[in-house]
Swiss-Prot record:
Any one Pfam family match given in the protein's UniProt record, by short name: CodY
One GO cellular component, as annotated: cytoplasm
Name by which UniProt lists this protein: Global transcriptional regulator CodY
Superkingdom per UniProt: Bacteria
Gene Ontology process terms (BP): negative regulation of DNA-templated transcription
Region (GAF domain), start-end ranges: 1-155
Family: Belongs to the CodY family.
Feature: DNA-binding region: 203-222
Length: 259
């Protein structure tokens, strides 16, 4: 397969990912196939976003990394010292992707490290490893193109997460703003009593203790539930089970109390 055909394969991956949920495992699988190497997509903190193994390495320490989906902190930190594509690193380098304790088994191994950059910042690192055979110039072109694709997907995922977070925050603010003064007071006491993200409480006891009617509590809970902020379920004489669905709620409520 020539460079153009391999580039087209990677283009196909990009077109598929552009309209779907980001799957770094699938991206790593495609890169393994195109680049014929072990492929690791590593986050800023050393987390394995996706990986695909072309040549199995029988080493317990390496297997543990893959199970935990996490490279050790010293290695992850070292990767960030690599500012540009560094190719054909041997087993004696601190940047090798092969276990140094099995030095003699991997004498011919080659590691290539490609920084993943997007939006002007370092987003992660693409680490490629072969038991033998150097990475050629064509391989490096494909590796850098792959890193660009991954960078775009990381940025897209970040943007989606930011959008989701902003939407959740807006929903909470609208729900809180819909409460009357007495309902807001009731909600503050309810979640102070709850002491976490879910639990059981008896509305009548809170109403008596705080000096408000039970209907105020019921109305306040209904407003939050209709906004999708919480879910509640009556358990009869035992009370009402409440679970917070929006993880921004307690923070916004606490911020309101602080003001």
């Amino acid at each position: 397969m020539n460079l153009l055909e391999k580039t087209r394969q990677l283009n196909t991956m990009l077109q598929q990912e552009a309209s779907a949920h980001v799957d770094f495992k699938e991206m790593a699988d495609k890169m393994r196939e195109v680049l014929e190497s072990n492929t690791f997509i590593v986050s800023r903190r050393g987390r394995l976003l996706g990986f695909a193994i072309k040549q199995q390495i029988e080493n317990d320490r390496m297997k543990a990394f893959l199970v935990d989906r996490q490279f050790p902190e010293p290695y992850a930190s070292n990767l960030f010292n690599v500012k540009e594509t560094t190719a054909n690193i041997d087993i004696d380098s601190e940047y090798t992707a092969f276990p140094v304790e099995n030095h003699d088994l991997f004498l011919n191994s080659k590691t290539t490290i490609v920084p993943i950059i997007g939006g002007g910042e370092r987003l992660g690192t693409l680490v490629l490893g072969r038991l033998a055979n150097e990475f050629t110039e064509d391989d490096l072109v494909l590796a850098e193109y792959s890193a660009t694709v991954v960078g775009m997907e990381i940025l897209r995922e970040k943007a989606a997460e930011a959008e989701t977070s902003a939407r959740k925050k807006a929903v909470v603010q609208m729900a809180i703003n819909s409460l009357s003064y007495s309902e807001l007071e009731a909600i503050e006491h309810i979640f102070e009593e709850l002491g976490g993200n879910e639990g059981l409480l008896v509305a009548s006891k809170i109403a008596d203790r705080v000096g408000i009617t039970r209907s105020v509590i019921v109305n306040a809970l209904r407003k939050l539930e209709s906004a999708g902020v919480i879910e509640s379920r009556s358990l009869g004489m035992k009370g009402t089970y409440i679970k917070i669905l929006n993880d921004n709620f307690l923070f916004e409520l606490q911020k309101l109390k602080s003001n």
